[in-house]
Regions:
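Short alpha-helical segment that forms part of, or immediately flanks, the ligand-binding pocket
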Residues: 45, 67-71, 85-86, 92
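Short alpha-helical donor nucleotide-sugar binding micro-motif in glycosyltransferases
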Residues: 46-51, 69, 141
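Nucleotide-activated donor-binding/catalytic signature segment of Leloir-type glycosyltransferases, i.e.
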Residues: 22-43
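Conserved acidic donor-binding segment of nucleotide-sugar-dependent glycosyltransferases
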Residues: 37, 90-91, 95-103, 110-117
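Short hydrophobic beta-strand element within catalytic cores of glycosyltransferases
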Residues: 75-80, 88
Length: 160
């Protein structure tokens, strides 16, 4: 992502967080890239709510950060592998790139910007994020357990 934005000096990138390679990334970053380090949740949320897009280049089984961005109404430009395929709805809440290369990221950013000023609906992103909410998870688990218990009780003539 850093390399891609170095090749797009007219575009701004804010990096929040840290990690073992942070100093290396800072040294290679151009003036259009701002490193903010670790931030409290309120600052992270505010930045996500005002971002054009959230770029997610990690290949994770299930990354929560894209869902957090979507819950702020922010579309995701994400790697089209792993959990992003579940957490990002292409064309609805964001778009994908399929290689972890600066060129693929640049292409995705340019495709995103070619869609216009507000290419993804804030409300659609937020609604999609609700699919992954704790409340929905609890409700569906409870329903699943109750259904299986009822089936088992019926099949084994168990009454309470």
């Amino acid at each position: 992502v850093i390399e891609a934005f170095n090749k797009m000096p007219d575009k701004r990138l804010f990096v929040i967080g840290g990690g073992p390679n942070l100093e290396k990334y800072k040294k290679m970053a151009g003036s259009n890239i701002t490193f903010m380090g670790y931030q409290p949740f309120a600052v992270l949320k505010e930045k996500m709510q005002h971002a054009k897009a959230f770029i997610f280049a990690a290949d994770e089984d299930f990354g929560m950060i894209p869902v957090e961005a979507e819950s702020c109404g922010t579309p995701v430009i994400g790697l089209g592998h792993g959990g992003s395929l579940e957490t990002v709805s292409e064309g609805e809440t964001g778009l994908f790139f399929y290689e972890q290369t600066p060129e693929a990221i640049m292409d995705a950013v340019n495709r995103f910007e070619s869609l216009g000023e507000m290419p993804f609906d804030y409300h659609v992103c937020r609604k999609w994020a609700e699919v992954f909410s704790e409340e929905r998870f609890k409700k569906e688990i409870r329903l699943f357990v109750e259904t299986k218990y009822a089936e088992f009780s019926y099949n084994h003539n168990i009454t309470i």
